[in-house]
Structure formats: structure tokens, C-alpha cells
């Protein structure tokens, strides 16, 4: 895993996940659980402290890699977002690209990256 981190192979068996982290059969743009962000993180600044997300995973971050920090978690404590201190690496477990047509606030993630590469 990137920068030396590792994963739970099954968040339900290994991490005690209780939220719905697999979207099926719910439509892709409909949120299935909430995420809470860490104050001061980029995700917190752009999307707020708490928001609803879609979900398509059964694996999850166990230990983030070097220089990465957990900045978002679901209510069952599954990692939903990580960031590097310099703000150039941001990772999320949800799929904002599938939600932004119905939930335009998720476009802010893509706008942030577009500004970084200018």
C-alpha cells in the first residue's frame, strides 16, 4: 500500500464495520452513511465537519502510510479520508465523482486538485 500503509482486507470481519459500506443495490449517487472530518483538515475546510457519502468498499485503511493522517471516519470508525501534511495527497474511500451531479458540493474536491496543478 502507498507509503508503507496497510489495509483491512474485510472491514466487517477485521474492523468491526457496521455501516453500509457497499452501495449495492442503492443507486450510486445516493449517500448510504455519514463521515465526520477532523477539524483543520482540508476535507473539513471544504466539505464541513459532517456529510453523507456513497460507498463501494469492503476493504479499508488499517494503518495509513508514512506522512499520511486519518482525517475522516464513518460512524463505525472506518477510515474514509486521509491527507498528507502538505495537502498534496488526499484520499477518500467514497466516490465524489459519482455524487457531484446530484450533490454539487463534491465538485470542490476536483476544483482543489485543478488549482494545485495550475
Model-derived regions: residue spans:
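Hydrophobic, aromatic-enriched interface-forming segments
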Residues: 1-3
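Amide-donor transfer/coupling interface in amidating biosynthetic enzymes
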Residues: 12-118
Amino acid at each position: 500500500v502507498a507509503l508503507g500503509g496497510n489495509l483491512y482486507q474485510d472491514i466487517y470481519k477485521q474492523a468491526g464495520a457496521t455501516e453500509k459500506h457497499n452501495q449495492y443495490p442503492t443507486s450510486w449517487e445516493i449517500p448510504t452513511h455519514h463521515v465526520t472530518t477532523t477539524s483543520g483538515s482540508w476535507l473539513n475546510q471544504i466539505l464541513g465537519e459532517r456529510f453523507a457519502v456513497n460507498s463501494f468498499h469492503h476493504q479499508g485503511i488499517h494503518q495509513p502510510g508514512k506522512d499520511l493522517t486519518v482525517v475522516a471516519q464513518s460512524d463505525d470508525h472506518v477510515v474514509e479520508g486521509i491527507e498528507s501534511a502538505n495537502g498534496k495527497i488526499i484520499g477518500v474511500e467514497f466516490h465524489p465523482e459519482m455524487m457531484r451531479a446530484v450533490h454539487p458540493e463534491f465538485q470542490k474536491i476536483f476544483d482543489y486538485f485543478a488549482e494545485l496543478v495550475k
